[in-house]
């Protein structure tokens, strides 16, 4: 079975992508011996996702590995604060998830419009270099305090319009059904399914 390299060390992302791509087999960056620091200096989620995918793809090719690569970049965009934290979501405060959430909530003190969305750009690069880019968005509001599980990102302060609860309150299945990452990744999975990627060799796609 042909495998896919995931261009991330974030275990939460890895777990979510594995749930979306049921029956597919994956390799992590550690599995392939990739230990470079990828500089994410783009101005958009799309640019950063492409950078990660291309750097890892180049490494995969150099190691003569017959694998596709999937990367993504994603984050929270809050309308009232000029769509911050945006591409800086993971390092917004410099103090990790708790600090990031606190900074968003502090910036929204006294503000009524708490409209926000989660955005993801996902990139697939096939072994021959064919590249596919997909976007996913899911809309909601920022709560005034943390609600639900606090273990991942902004989930406990992002109230999903579709679910009627925060991502921190949602079950894994509920979140996967509406998440920005799931929306972006599903067309990539559909493409790989359509070419029977798991059963192909290089000459067949």
Write out the residue ranges for each language-model feature.
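Anionic-ligand binding patches
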Residues: 2-5, 11-205
């Amino acid at each position: 079975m042909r495998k896919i390299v995931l261009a991330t060390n974030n275990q939460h992302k890895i777990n979510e992508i594995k749930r979306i791509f049921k029956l597919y087999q994956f390799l992590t960056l550690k599995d392939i011996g990739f230990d470079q620091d990828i500089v994410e200096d783009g101005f958009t989620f799309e640019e950063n996702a492409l950078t990660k995918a291309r750097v890892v793809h180049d490494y995969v090719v150099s190691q003569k590995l017959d694998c596709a690569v999937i990367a993504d970049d994603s984050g929270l965009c809050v309308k009232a604060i000029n769509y911050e934290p945006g591409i800086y979501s993971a390092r917004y405060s410099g103090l990790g998830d708790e600090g990031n959430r606190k900074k968003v909530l502090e910036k929204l003190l006294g503000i009524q419009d708490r409209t926000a969305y989660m955005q993801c750009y996902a990139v697939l690069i096939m072994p021959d270099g064919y590249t596919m880019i997909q976007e996913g968005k899911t809309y909601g509001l920022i709560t005034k305090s943390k609600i639900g599980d606090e273990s991942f990102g902004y989930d406990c302060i992002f109230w999903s319009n579709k679910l009627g609860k925060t991502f921190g309150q949602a079950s894994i299945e509920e979140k996967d059904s509406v998440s920005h990452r799931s929306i972006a990744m599903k067309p990539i999975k559909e493409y790989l399914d359509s070419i029977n990627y798991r059963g192909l060799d290089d000459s067949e796609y």
